[in-house]
Structure formats: structure tokens, C-alpha cells
Amino acid sequence: MGFLKVLATSLATLAVVDAGTLLTASNTDAVIPSSYIVVMNDDVSTAEFNTHREWATNVHARLSRRKNGETGPGKHFEINGLKGYTASFDESTAKDIANDPAVKYIEPDMIVNATANVVQSNVPSWGLARISSKRTGTTSYTYDSTAGEGVVFYGVDTGIDISHSDFGGRAKWGTNVVDNDNTDGNGHGTHTASTAAGSKYGVAKKATLVAVKVLGADGSGTNSGVISGMDWAVKDAKSRGANGKYVMNMSLGGEFSKAVNDAAANVVKSGIFLSVAAGNEAENASNSSPASAAEVCTIAASTSTDGSASFTNFGSVVDLYAPGQSITAAYPGGGSKTLSGTSMAAPHVAGVAAYLMALEGVSAGNACARIVQLATSSISRAPSGTTSKLLYNGINV
């Protein structure tokens, strides 16, 4: 893999060699100006990757195109072999960097948001009871006492209020790529973590929880920040040992992003189950990321009467439904809150994945298929081309 190591060599010579592509965004409103994610070819070695980043830094400095304070290459990541980095370039420099044959593609960095969309008060939660029964209307949650013990849950979100009583001392901070405030200033991350693994509100009541903060107090972040969070979690899981059991929940989404999808795919390949919210735009989930990644478990939201929630995204990329309307779970400050959205549906599935890993020893790579196998065909009037499968923990199977 050749790199341009002598700056005096014309950049034009690279154009005749197979090189990367500068991708464009379908929704320019989501694009962060002058911000990019650079992804390298699969066969680029670590040494070549380092050399490329040094070269890119020099190209950025030499071309002096920094009209808006662009700073050049930034943080780099390596997720189970997927190498890349964030960068602040003007468009002309980005095109020049894309001409390096070591580059697979460059895409604009974009805004990503938490996917909860409705807040309701004084509504009892019903999701736990529904996932342990084959019919509606039950009021008890039945589960095996293993309850996700020995499994690590990564909440890639707005953070977790680790002092909340619903976590019973099982939650800790992992990383924060947003700011220096290791708190959940939004509440979304605490709620989703509680749904997955809270002692009172959660599915896998004995799992360990790790906060991976990639969204700020306003519920928004960047694709590059999300990728950094995934990168950290993969490395943390690796440090814990190859025989560990790991699940990740990402109740967030944005415009379609090849970089985010590729990163999510490599999270799964590394041995971490990944549950993802389908999104709340009432449109085909293939338009958003990471929901459209083939390797993840993409979750739509159901109602208490087994309907498809009016807001949920849909389509062939959806693996199954889970309770997502009027879900009560822990909230920062010691209390609880009732929220609706595919954000609430996805952690139910992450919790069941942790539950099955502890109970059956199912692997991360097979967990989504096992969950779909156990699911009941209960959703009435699912949108055309969308599964009718509804999450079920298999307690009476």
C-alpha cells in the first residue's frame, strides 16, 4: 500500500491509482461543516495507517486552505480491524486526501440524536410483563434468576446516573467523548439503561452496566463521537477477556452513514451484541444509521395492544418489535419517567440478549437470531414488508 511520502510529489499522480470516494450526505442539514470521517482500506496495516495520518496532517498544513479554522486530522479509531479517523478539512483538502489509495472512503460527519420522542406522565409500565408472556394484559414479569449475571451492558447514549438506586451499585462510568461532565444531563441514557438492566424496571437485573457517553444534555451528538464510543467499548470488552459476554444498546440515530454502519458491523464481529433503535420518523429504517446496518439487531416499537406504534420506523431491516410506548424506567435524580420511542424498545432487546447469554450461553453473534426465534408473531397490522415478530424471553418455552 503506497502513500505519498514526499510532499513535493504532485497530488495528481494519486488520481491514476485506485483511491477512495468522497461520499455525500442525502440530508445536508445534518452535515457538520468541514468535519469528516476518513475510513481506510481493510488491508492497511497499523504502520501504514500512522504514516497516512502524518501525511494527511502535512498536506493539510501545506495547502493552507483553513478558511474556517479547520484543524486537520483528529481522533483515530480501530474497531475490530476497521481503521479510520475524524478530521477537520475544507472540501478541497478532503478530496485530495480521498485520492490516497489507502483511503476507502471519506464521508461528512453528521449530527446524531437520541430517538425518544414522547413524554407521558402517570402511566404504569407494561413492557416487562409483555415480554415474558405470549398474550397481552398480564401484569407480572417472569424470568430466570440468572437475570443477566456475568454480562456487561454498554449504554452508548447520554450517560447513566450510576448512583440511582435502580442500578444497585452495578453501574459505572466507562468513557465520555462529549464533555468533562460525567453525569446524564438529559435522562435518556439512564432510562434506556434502566430498561435493559435496572433492578426494578429492567430485564437483565444482574448485569453490569457501563456508561458510554456520546450524546450531550440536549440529546444530540456526532457520528464521529458515536464511532469513538463504539471504539472504546470494543477495546474495553477486549481488556475484560475473550470469554466475556457483552451487549450494547444504541438508542440513537441519524441520516444514513456508511462509516457508522461499518463501525457497528465491526462491533458485532468483535463479539458484542448490538441492539439499535429503528427510529421515530415513521419511515423506512433503511434510511438511517446505525439502524440500517445488516449486522445489528434493529428494533421497532410496539404498543400495549400489540400494534405498531404510530411513530416507529419500519421495513425489511427491522428484526423485531419490542415494547416502546409509555415505558416507565429510572430517571436521573432518583425518580422515574415514562417515555415513548424506539429508544425504549431497543433496550428491552438488549436486556433479553444479556438474559439469554447468562441463561443459555448464547453467543453475541447468534443472539439476535435466537431472540427472533423465540419471538411471537403478535404485531397486528405491521407496515408492509415489516416483520410481525414481538420480543419474548422464552420463559415458558
UniProtKB/Swiss-Prot annotation:
<keyword id="KW-0720">Serine protease</keyword>
<dbReference type="Pfam" id="PF00082">
    <property type="entry name" value="Peptidase_S8"/>
</dbReference>
<feature type="active site" description="Charge relay system">
    <location>
        <position position="188"/>
    </location>
</feature>
<feature type="domain" description="Inhibitor I9">
    <location>
        <begin position="35"/>
        <end position="113"/>
    </location>
</feature>
<keyword id="KW-0645">Protease</keyword>
<dbReference type="InterPro" id="IPR036852">
    <property type="entry name" value="Peptidase_S8/S53_dom_sf"/>
</dbReference>
<dbReference type="InterPro" id="IPR023828">
    <property type="entry name" value="Peptidase_S8_Ser-AS"/>
</dbReference>
<keyword id="KW-0020">Allergen</keyword>
<feature type="domain" description="Peptidase S8">
    <location>
        <begin position="125"/>
        <end position="397"/>
    </location>
</feature>
<dbReference type="InterPro" id="IPR015500">
    <property type="entry name" value="Peptidase_S8_subtilisin-rel"/>
</dbReference>
<dbReference type="Pfam" id="PF05922">
    <property type="entry name" value="Inhibitor_I9"/>
</dbReference>
<feature type="site" description="Not glycosylated">
    <location>
        <position position="113"/>
    </location>
</feature>
<comment type="function">
    <text>Serine protease. Hydrolyzes azocasein. Cleaves peptide bonds of the oxidized insulin B chain preferably at 15-Leu-|-Tyr-16, but also at 4-Gln-|-His-5 and 24-Phe-|-Phe-25, and to a lesser extent at 5-His-|-Leu-6 and 25-Phe-|-Tyr-26. Hydrolyzes amide bonds between amino acids and 7-amino-4-methylcoumarin (AMC) in vitro.</text>
</comment>
<keyword id="KW-0378">Hydrolase</keyword>
<feature type="propeptide" description="Removed in mature form">
    <location>
        <begin position="20"/>
        <end position="115"/>
    </location>
</feature>
<keyword id="KW-0732">Signal</keyword>
<feature type="active site" description="Charge relay system">
    <location>
        <position position="343"/>
    </location>
</feature>
<feature type="site" description="Not glycosylated">
    <location>
        <position position="284"/>
    </location>
</feature>
<keyword id="KW-0964">Secreted</keyword>
<dbReference type="InterPro" id="IPR037045">
    <property type="entry name" value="S8pro/Inhibitor_I9_sf"/>
</dbReference>
<dbReference type="InterPro" id="IPR050131">
    <property type="entry name" value="Peptidase_S8_subtilisin-like"/>
</dbReference>
<dbReference type="GO" id="GO:0004252">
    <property type="term" value="F:serine-type endopeptidase activity"/>
</dbReference>
<feature type="site" description="Not glycosylated">
    <location>
        <position position="249"/>
    </location>
</feature>
<dbReference type="InterPro" id="IPR034193">
    <property type="entry name" value="PCSK9_ProteinaseK-like"/>
</dbReference>
<comment type="similarity">
    <text>Belongs to the peptidase S8 family.</text>
</comment>
<feature type="signal peptide">
    <location>
        <begin position="1"/>
        <end position="19"/>
    </location>
</feature>
<dbReference type="GO" id="GO:0006508">
    <property type="term" value="P:proteolysis"/>
</dbReference>
<feature type="active site" description="Charge relay system">
    <location>
        <position position="157"/>
    </location>
</feature>
<feature type="site" description="Important for catalytic activity">
    <location>
        <position position="280"/>
    </location>
</feature>
<keyword id="KW-0865">Zymogen</keyword>
<dbReference type="InterPro" id="IPR010259">
    <property type="entry name" value="S8pro/Inhibitor_I9"/>
</dbReference>
<dbReference type="GO" id="GO:0005615">
    <property type="term" value="C:extracellular space"/>
</dbReference>
<dbReference type="InterPro" id="IPR000209">
    <property type="entry name" value="Peptidase_S8/S53_dom"/>
</dbReference>
<protein>
    <recommendedName>
        <fullName>Subtilisin-like serine protease Pen c 1</fullName>
        <ecNumber>3.4.21.-</ecNumber>
    </recommendedName>
</protein>
